[in-house]
């Protein structure tokens, strides 16, 4: 293994752990201060809310709701802003009232909930499903001895970030294949360097997604498994808010989630609208936008899958403790137990 990969193994480095602790302490202090929990009114009399989106994608329904007038019909003026690159760091902005809603993924949210931050999921955005082709996955060199996730024992896997959903699904898939996830060495590398790392033999495999997955295949790498689709219902993107704001603004929150549900239906029926948002707001290559498989958007959170994720994240050491089951979902959030 090359020297630059040595320190970053299964868990975060001392520096990243310290940053995480500081962020959590700061968020806790902000929560104690209460923030501004009163919904503000825009100049036209509508209720003003701010949403922090991801910097990648999966935020398309937010812009569709704006463009199709679903927010306006609900009496809302919604400001959509790019949030933190690591969406798990959006919690402080929600807790201090800078934003009323923010995006993250299941692992990012559960880490906040496990630290007893007063945040609640209000809606899913997108979940893993067997209905569409995988948009993420494990890549190995052609001719590699790795033929299934079980073969990852004793191997080094490159990821763009440690401790998140991609590491979770890699460990989950290994466990499901009969392997021991604790015997995998995970290393963090720049997303743009992952494919080269496995091609050059610096790592045995990489877990990547979107256009980088396609580029890896085009470069001769072999995909193993079906990515996050191995756990249908796994929330890949969701929206959350603060418990205190929701308690005082339940009607506004319901208007927002209802408008988002309309946007989900519209996006699912009009994939060209999703591609248009990608073209305008992402840096994805034009060819990828034109040809990519667009996954279904949906509001319900699969509670059974969420419990599986919690249990396994604790077992894998990705969560120090399980969050209180009553501190995860907003009381009016849509749920399901029948993901496919």
Label for each model-derived stretch:
Residues 107, 187, 192-277:
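Pocket-lining segment of extracytoplasmic ligand-binding domains
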Residues 1-11, 21-26:
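N-terminal secretory signal peptides
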Residues 34-37:
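Bacterial signal peptide processing site
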Residues 28-32:
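C-terminal motif of bacterial Sec signal peptides marking the signal peptidase cleavage site
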Residues 314-340:
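Conserved C-terminal helix/tail region of periplasmic/extracytoplasmic solute-binding proteins
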Residues 247-320:
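Secondary-structure end/capping motifs
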Residues 42-172, 176-177, 188, 204, ...:
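Short, glycine-/small- and polar/acidic-enriched structural segments
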Residues 13-18, 198:
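N-terminal export leaders
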């Amino acid at each position: 293994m090359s020297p630059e990969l040595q320190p970053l193994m299964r868990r975060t480095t001392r520096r990243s752990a310290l940053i995480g602790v500081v962020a959590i302490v700061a968020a806790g202090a902000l929560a104690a201060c209460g923030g501004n929990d009163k919904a503000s009114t825009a100049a036209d009399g509508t209720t003003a809310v701010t949403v922090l989106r991801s910097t990648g994608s999966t935020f398309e329904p937010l812009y569709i709701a704006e463009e199709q007038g679903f927010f306006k019909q609900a009496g809302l003026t919604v400001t959509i802003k790019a949030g933190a690159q690591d969406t798990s760091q959006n919690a402080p902005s929600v807790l201090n009232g800078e934003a009323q809603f923010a995006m993250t993924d299941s692992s990012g949210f559960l880490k906040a909930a496990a630290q007893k931050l007063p945040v609640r999921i209000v809606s899913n955005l997108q979940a893993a499903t067997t209905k569409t082709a995988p948009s993420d996955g494990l890549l190995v060199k052609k001719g590699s001895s790795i033929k299934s996730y079980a073969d990852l024992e004793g191997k080094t896997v490159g990821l763009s970030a440690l401790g998140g959903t991609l590491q979770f699904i890699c460990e989950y898939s290994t466990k499901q294949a009969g392997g021991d996830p604790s015997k995998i060495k995970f290393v963090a590398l720049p997303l743009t360097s992952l494919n080269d790392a496995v091609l050059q033999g610096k790592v045995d495999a990489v877990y990547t997604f979107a256009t980088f997955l396609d580029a890896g295949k085009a470069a001769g790498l072999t995909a193993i498994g079906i990515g996050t689709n191995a756990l249908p219902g796994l929330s890949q993107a969701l929206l959350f808010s603060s418990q205190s704001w929701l308690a005082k603004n339940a009607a506004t929150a319901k208007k927002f989630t209802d408008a988002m549900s309309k946007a989900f239906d519209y996006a699912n029926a009009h994939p060209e609208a999703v591609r248009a948002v990608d073209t305008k707001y992402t840096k994805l290559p034009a060819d990828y936008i034109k040809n990519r498989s667009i996954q279904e958007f949906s509001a319900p959170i699969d509670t059974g899958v969420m419990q599986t994720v919690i249990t396994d994240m604790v077992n894998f050491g990705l969560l120090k403790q399980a969050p209180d089951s009553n501190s995860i979902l907003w009381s009016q959030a849509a749920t399901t137990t029948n993901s496919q």
